[in-house]
Amino acid sequence: MMSSSSSEIDVVKTRIPTYDEDDDTILYAYETKPDFVNKEPNTVSDASCNTEEQQKTVNDVLIHCQVIYDAMQNLDKKIDVIRRKVSKIQRFRARSLWTNRKRYGYKNYSYQLAKKLKRQKMKKNEVHESFSYPESYSPTLPVSRRENNSPSNLPRPSFRMEEYQRAEPEEDPILSRTPSPVHPSDFSEHNYQPYYASDGAMHGSSSGPCLGNPGANSIYNTYSTDHASAAQPSVTSSPFENDRYIEEGSITKHPSTWSVEAVVLFLKQTDPLALCPLVDLFRSHEIDGKALLLLTSDVLLKHLGVKLGTAVKLCYYIDRLKQGKCFEN
């Protein structure tokens, strides 16, 4: 008999003949088809293959998940390290701000110290100015005092242009032919000699101006027509032995009409220590009175190459000339 689970399609039905003619019983033989027998194992093998592939896929997914988890763990560790470093930097900055912070009253202390130094500097300047005459032209170069027992302890003439204008006699033809007098300078180590002028050549140094007697009101007060024919005594050499004669009328009332040599003499007698090195420079550039009044600190520094301190002093003296403190307006 055929089992209930098997179908007629998978079974081969065969009739079995009987030898009894009187018996109506019919016998059948059932056999399984060979194709069905061979087909069933293939189905089982395909199912097992699918199961293995599924397990392999699951394993791959789990492996990738593990890799991702490990990467996240490493990233968390790196983030923790970065946070610790940032917090350390912040603590260091906060500590440096608190340690370098100025204490209370520091500003007031520095202000008092600066004020004290300023007072000391003002006292030094007052002491320094007490050693110089009020007629001193230079604010930085003190004028040495003469001794009380000096024979030439007389009032010193200052650098005033009106004295030279007042000293020029207009009616005397003899004096009109003599060179113009120069500015008297303050030299305590040189003795002043009497000065006489005539038509002939001047005795003494031929390259420098002669200095008059400072005891008189002017150089020409000691001169009279009675002394024109008198013998001319010898005169000591001037402190500026290398200077040339200043031409007549070169030093006039206003500095804008000065010649180059008058400007050079002005530099030497104003501040010899600071301005004497500029003599050759002024002569080479032929700087006269007009050019002197037009000089500025920028021109002196950039174009003439003068040092800063010397340029400041010279600009100060030029401002004094412009204000009319050394000549009459």
Curated annotation (Swiss-Prot):
Domain of life: Eukaryota
Function: Putative Polycomb group (PcG) protein. PcG proteins act by forming multiprotein complexes, which are required to maintain the transcriptionally repressive state of homeotic genes throughout development. May be involved in spermatogenesis during sexual maturation.
Protein name per its UniProtKB record: Sex comb on midleg-like protein 1
Positions of region (Disordered): 125-194
Keywords of this entry: Nucleus, Phosphoprotein, Repressor, Transcription, Transcription regulation
Cellular-component GO terms for this entry: nucleus
Protein's cellular compartments: Nucleus
Basic and acidic residues: compositionally biased ranges: 159-168
Sites of Phosphoserine modification: S138, S238
Domain SAM: 258-325
A GO molecular-function descriptor: histone binding
GO biological process, one term: negative regulation of DNA-templated transcription
Pfam family, one: SAM_1
UniProt source species: Macaca mulatta
Tissue: Highly expressed in testis and pancreas. Preferentially expressed in the germ stem cells of testis.
PROSITE patterns: SAM_DOMAIN (PS50105)
